[in-house]
Amino acid sequence: DRLYFEPLSAESVIEIYKKENSNGKVLGVYVQFGGQTPLKIAKQLEKSGINILGTSTEAIDLAEDRDLFSNTLNELKINQPKNGISNNIDDILNIANHIGYPVLVRPSYVLGGRAMEIAYDNKSLESYAKTAMMVSTNNTILIDKYLENATEIDVDLIRDSKGNVFIAGIMEHIEEAGIHSGDSACSLPPFSLNKSMENKITKWVSDIANKINVIGLMNTQLAIKDNALYVLEVNP
């Protein structure tokens, strides 16, 4: 085994791949173990001739593209908070007013909850949106109805190419929904979920993994408000 201390960029990975491939055929690379950064460069790696192991770039897009993912949840008849997506300030304000405040605003394809904020009116939303657009890959902003006082749930699973799903853990956040998972504490096993809700969560995340055709790891973030379950996002 070898360990490389290099920037996690397409250029660095391609150079390392070429070097390793010269010593013997490399089957491909996994992009599921480093958060958003490797997911963002997956298509560049694939275009350069590198085989992406595990979840395909098409499946990654199904999870990461808000419109595609929203349509997927609708097809599965899975609840999601009211939401919209835009790269125009006026449209963002119109979407928020249609959804109803408070809203959660965040840029697409970023890691660590960067520029994620809760807006309670047009003035704060406009300010947050401008900041979020600066760090978004394509100036695209996601606007979700913020579920106040909701319980947030994190689920990690593994799925193989034959469709077998193993739930690694259902974790219940100590803080209410809206605090980024990297900044919050959680309980494993969950401390307030009944068996019926756990079964529903298990079915939903398994259905999503099968629909998207995840091969390998998948993280799902959900919220429970007034005993209703919602899917917030999926990270393959």
Model-derived segments and spans:
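N-terminal beta-alpha lobe that positions the nucleotide/phosphoryl donor
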Residues: 2-220, 224-236
